[in-house]
C-alpha cells in the first residue's frame, strides 16, 4: 500500500514562508540592529476525534450505466463512420422489438453495446444485421435476436428495473454477449476454453472498460465453482445435455438457459440431430424444472482447453 508524504502543518511561522534577506552590513561605530521577528502563532487546540462508524459490507456492483459504455464506444470508434453511430444500434434494437423482444432493459443493452467492435473489420458492415458471423477457430458470434431472447428468458419474472445478480456465461467467444450481459447484471463471469478467443475477447472489451465483468480461461463444462452460486447461467454452445457441474452451481431460484441437442426418433430414416433452447429453473436443492423452447443452431459444447 502506498503512503502519502507528510504535509506541512498550517499556519506556518511567517519566516517560514517569506524569503529571508541577509542582515545589513555593520556600520563602523554603530551596533547592529536586529530585524524584529513575529512571534510564532499559538497552535489551535486539537479537535476532538470524531467517533468511527462501524464498517459495513461493500455494496454489490451495479450494471455499467449505458451512457458510460456509449461514451467509451464513441471514443474507441472515433472516425468509424456509420457503424460507430448509435443510430445503427438503435435500429437493431427496434427490429428486435418488432420481432417480439419485450424486455426494455435487454433492448437498451443491445442499443448500447457496439457490436462492430467484436467482429472482424471486413465484416463490420454486417455487424448490425441479425446474423451470426464467424469469429475464427470455427466459432461464431450469435445472432443479436438469439442473444436478446436468451437473456430475456433469464430475466423473466424480474421487475423492469431489477438487474440479474451473479451471472455465469459458458463460451465467451469474442465477448459481445458478455458485454450485453454486463448491462443487465450486477456481476458477470465468462469462461472461454480457446485461448486465442479468450485473448481476443479481452482486447475487444478493453476499450469499453467494463468493471463488473470477469473473463476466465478454462473448461466451461466445469463451471466456476469458486464464484458459485449463480442466479443465472447461459451457455453459448450446444451439448447433448447440460453438464451436472453447472446445475450444481445454479442458485436455488436461479435460471439456466442452454441450447441442447435433440435426437431424432429411433427408426425414422433421413432425420438429423437438431437443437432447441432449454430453460432450467432450480426450485430447491434437488428439484429442477425444465422447459423446452424453440429450435436454434449453435456450435458444439466441448470439454477441455486449447
From Swiss-Prot:
Swiss-Prot/TrEMBL keywords: Cytoplasm, Methyltransferase, S-adenosyl-L-methionine, Transferase
Keyword set includes Acetylation: no
Pro residues bias locations: 38-48
Entry superkingdom: Bacteria
Single GO MF descriptor: protein-L-isoaspartate (D-aspartate) O-methyltransferase activity
Keyword field contains Methyltransferase: yes
Residues annotated as catalytic: 142
Major localisation: cytoplasm
Low complexity composition-biased segments: 54-77
Matching CDD domains: AdoMet_MTases (cd02440)
Coiled coil: none
InterPro entries tied to this protein: PCMT, SAM-dependent_MTases_sf
Cell location: Cytoplasm
Catalytic activity: [protein]-L-isoaspartate + S-adenosyl-L-methionine = [protein]-L-isoaspartate alpha-methyl ester + S-adenosyl-L-homocysteine
A GO term from the CC aspect: cytoplasm
Chain positions covered by the region annotation Disordered: 1-82
E.C. numbers: 2.1.1.77
Record Pfam families: PCMT
GO biological process, one term: protein repair
Protein family (similarity comment): Belongs to the methyltransferase superfamily. L-isoaspartyl/D-aspartyl protein methyltransferase family.
Described function: Catalyzes the methyl esterification of L-isoaspartyl residues in peptides and proteins that result from spontaneous decomposition of normal L-aspartyl and L-asparaginyl residues. It plays a role in the repair and/or degradation of damaged proteins.
Protein name, as recorded: Protein-L-isoaspartate O-methyltransferase 2
Organism ancestry: Bacteria, Pseudomonadati, Pseudomonadota, Betaproteobacteria, Burkholderiales
Originating gene: pcm2
